[in-house]
Swiss-Prot record:
Species in which this protein is naturally found: Thermotoga maritima (strain ATCC 43589 / DSM 3109 / JCM 10099 / NBRC 100826 / MSB8)
Gene: mutS2
Record-given protein name: Endonuclease MutS2
Source organism phylogeny: Bacteria, Thermotogati, Thermotogota, Thermotogae, Thermotogales
PANTHER family recorded: OS10G0509000 PROTEIN, OS10G0509000 PROTEIN-RELATED
E.C. number(s) listed in UniProt: 3.1.-.-, 3.6.4.-
Subunit structure: Homodimer. Binds to stalled ribosomes, contacting rRNA. Interacts with MutL.
GO molecular function term, any single one: double-stranded DNA binding
NCBIfam families reported for this sequence: mutS2
Activity regulation, free text: Nuclease activity is stimulated by interaction with MutL and inhibited in the presence of non-hydrolytic ATP (ADPnP). ATPase activity is stimulated by DNA.
């Protein structure tokens, strides 16, 4: 029994097939079915998706379906020139793809496609022997060149003689010309003059007035041309056979290349599908959890994401709610996504989604839209359920839609409960939809089951398609009837016919729905506040980092200026000595030594004076020539440890000047306003086209503010936006480098860019 069809599996595969490059990939996609070990395929899809996000599309050349050409080679028939060209381009594409993955860091892709065999010699031979238009080149063989050279010489001789014949026999010709038919040069001779020249008549015009004659003097020449043409044909056949035999001798390698390219094309299509549907690669887990799962058959503008989690201590969901509320789509999505994951497909959902491997996936999907189900429909469903119950075990995922419907509600409910109990006893994991109140109550009291319902908006009389976990759904019949204007007297009459327990249950369900709606609203508010808090926290952390960076840059500048000054003074002294007009060289050297000794003595004296009399822990100081004020922490051996707020430096006391604490504010040239410019931008939610001007302006702002590094927050998702940002940065000559952030900077959700300043 094909349960995959009832879960829409084949329809989704058809969508994916549209992204394949050739029939090779489309055929491979048709072979993918759920398996208990989908790791291989999923890891390859994940690596190729990461490749796309970083490098864009891989180099693809001529990766077409050459299955027919391979079959022809196997049969022993030589390939035609255009077929050889097609195979050659395909094999050249294999080489390009193999080399591309060899130089990248994707181990699974590298390992898989390293098995592609190189046919470089064959490709070179084809390029030598066959022109791009499919004609056999003169370079194909020396013999072919000889034949064509002789044929060309002979043809020129015949044309020269033919021109002479036309000129000398113009009186017998119907027209001053000759024709080339069936490899022979013929002349249109007047029928009445056909005996004027010896030759062979080949054709007669429809009017009978003209005969096409081959003069005897041309017969031998024409025969020689025909012979050369036959030799040319045989030589070309030999060349084509020779090229085909190269492929035949490596048939196993050729077939393996075709299989590997079919697999690559299949992976390519799945990755394109993931990028188009904002999908992610979900790997087998020990639990079931859907995070913003989107059924791929529902148009993007109308799909409502499904969020659902089955706790480890539970083995089933009973989902209730009004018709057209999304129950069937919800359970179908669970089954479909499980089957797709087990077949190696990415899923249209968010990160955090988890799915289990089930060796058996079985489903009976009802017709939720049916107004009235007949006995035959009930029998049809029951036949499927009998098969499911018979085969179910602890390895089974069972999807049952509208269980117990289509018959008497009391009997249907009893039957549904009995079926659910049997499936749970066998260890199956179940997802069931129903309208029946006894089944809802049963689920509320069963330790292995969870109730869920589809949210309904009584104000608009329409479903929201959101799943509410932990509470059964109501029919909302009275609310809908009242809203549509049914007499209240009739509605009250209907209510009075409900049992006390039924009224209490409906009231309880309604109350739970209201409370859950409030909790969901609070949850959304808290989530929004948390996101705002995280943004604020990131902002302050960045402000702190920027302030610290600018402080360090300020001290670097001061130290550079100090060193420049020292070098300048030394240079001036050297020049003074060099241009001195009096005194000997030895005297000059002695004078320099004396100056340097005095300088050292002076500095030592300043150190001692500063250490003993001036600089002490707690003092506020500035570096010589500097503006930033710091506080002395300790003084040891002529060196002070100074705290400048965001930075501590060890500085010779001779380079420090005591100052007042207030001077820090008055004299410091350092000024930073974190609110004036931020070194990060958040482009999440934008398209690449929307983000491009924002990113370029951000680079402008960085350079105008003299800041070399910035952070672009694009989020993770499919990586399409990140890939687009990298392409923008790669083309911008102002950009020095860019990379993904470290874990502390935001990981692959952030790009760190450095610009020229």
């Amino acid at each position: 029994m094909d349960y995959l069809e009832s879960l829409d599996f084949p329809k989704v595969v058809e969508i994916v097939k549209k992204y394949a490059l050739s029939d090779l990939g489309r055929k491979h996609l048709d072979t993918l079915k759920p398996t208990v070990n989908p790791w291989d395929e999923l890891e390859l899809v994940e690596e190729l998706l990461n490749y796309f996000n970083r490098w864009g599309e891989p180099p693809i050349k001529g990766l077409n379906d050459i299955s027919q050409e391979v079959e022809k080679v196997k049969s022993g028939s030589p390939l035609e020139p255009w077929e050889l060209l097609r195979v050659s381009v395909f094999l050249e594409g294999c080489d390009i793809l193999k080399k591309e993955f060899e130089k990248r860091e994707y181990s699974r892709l590298k390992e898989t496609f390293s098995r592609l065999s190189s046919f470089r010699e064959f490709v070179e031979e084809v390029n030598r022997c066959i022109e791009q238009d499919g004609e056999i080149s003169d370079r194909a063989s020396p013999r072919l060149r000889e034949i064509r050279t002789e044929k060309k010489r002979l043809s020129s001789e015949i044309k020269r003689k033919a021109d002479d014949f036309v000129r000398t026999h113009s009186q017998i010709l119907q027209e001053q010309m000759y024709v080339y038919r069936d490899g022979r040069y013929l002349f249109p001779v007047k029928a009445s003059m056909k005996n004027a020249v010896r030759g062979i008549v080949h054709h007669l015009s429809s009017s009978g007035a003209t005969v096409f004659l081959e003069p005897d003097e041309f017969v031998e020449l024409n025969n020689r041309v025909r012979l050369l043409e036959e030799e040319e044909r045989l030589e070309i056949s030999r060349i084509l056979r020779q090229l085909t035999n190269i492929l035949l001798s490596r048939l196993n390698d050729l077939e393996r290349n075709v299989e590997l390219i079919a697999r690559f094309d299949s992976l390519y299509a799945r990755v394109k599908f993931a990028r188009e549907f904002n999908g992610t690669v979900v790997k087998p887990s020990s639990r079931i959890r859907l995070v913003n799962a989107r059924h791929p058959l529902i148009p993007k503008e109308r799909v409502v994401p499904i969020n659902l989690e089955l706790p480890p201590n539970k083995r089933g969901f009973i989902i209730t709610g009004p018709n057209m509320g999304g129950k069937t789509v919800t359970v179908k999505t669970v089954g479909l996504f499980t089957a797709l994951m087990m077949s190696g497909f990415p899923l249209p959902c968010d990160e955090g989604t988890e799915l289990k491997v089930f060796p058996k996936i079985m489903a009976d999907i009802g017709e939720e839209q049916s107004i009235e189900q007949s006995l035959s429909t009930f029998s049809s469903h029951m036949k499927k359920i009998v098969e499911i119950v018979k085969n179910a075990d602890s390895d089974s995922l069972v999807i049952l839609d509208e269980l117990g419907s289509g018959t008497d509600p009391v009997e249907g409910a009893a039957l549904a409960i009995a079926i659910i109990e049997d499936l749970l006893e066998k260890g199956a994991t179940i997802f069931v939809t129903t309208h029946l109140t006894p089944v809802k109550v049963f689920a509320m009291n069963h330790p292995l089951l969870l109730n869920a319902s589809m949210e309904f908006d009584p104000e608009t009389l329409s479903p929201t398609y959101r799943v509410l976990v932990g509470v059964p759904g109501g029919s909302h019949a009275f609310q809908i009837a009242e809203k549509l204007g049914l007499d209240k007297r009739i509605i009250e009459n209907a209510r009075s016919r409900l049992s006390r327990e039924e009224m209490e249950l409906e009231g309880l369900i309604r109350s739970l729905h209201e409370k859950i709606s409030l909790l969901e609203e609070e949850k959304r508010k808290l989530q929004k506040e948390r996101e705002e808090y995280m943004k604020l926290r990131e902002k302050y952390e960045e402000d702190y980092k920027k302030l610290r960076r600018m402080k360090i840059e300020e001290f670097d500048k001061e130290l550079r200026e100090l060193n420049d000054y020292i070098r300048k003074v030394k240079k001036e002294l050297d020049q003074a000595i060099h241009v001195a007009k009096t005194g000997s060289v030895d005297e000059m050297r002695e004078a320099v030594k004396t100056i340097e000794k005095e300088k050292k003595d002076l500095e030592q004296k300043r150190i001692e004076e500063a250490t003993e009399e001036e600089i002490k822990p707690g003092d506020h100081v500035k570096m010589e020539g500097g503006t930033s004020v710091g506080k002395v922490v300790e003084v040891k051996s002529g060196t002070a440890l100074v705290d400048f707020g965001f930075l501590r430096l060890k500085v010779p006391v001779s380079k420090l000047r005591k100052t007042k604490k207030e001077e820090k504010k008055e004299t410091s040239t350092f000024s930073y306003k974190p609110s004036s410019f931020r070194t990060e931008i958040d482009i999440r939610g934008m398209t690449v086209e929307e983000a491009e001007p924002v990113v370029k302006k951000f680079i402008d702002d960085l350079m105008m503010n003299g800041i070399s590094k910035g952070y672009i927050i694009h989020g993770k998702g499919t990586g399409k936006l990140a890939s687009g940002v990298w392409e923008i940065l790669r083309k911008d000559k102002r950009v020095v480098s860019f990379r993904f952030g470290t874990p502390s900077e935001g990981g692959t959700g952030v790009t760190v860019v450095e610009v020229k300043v």
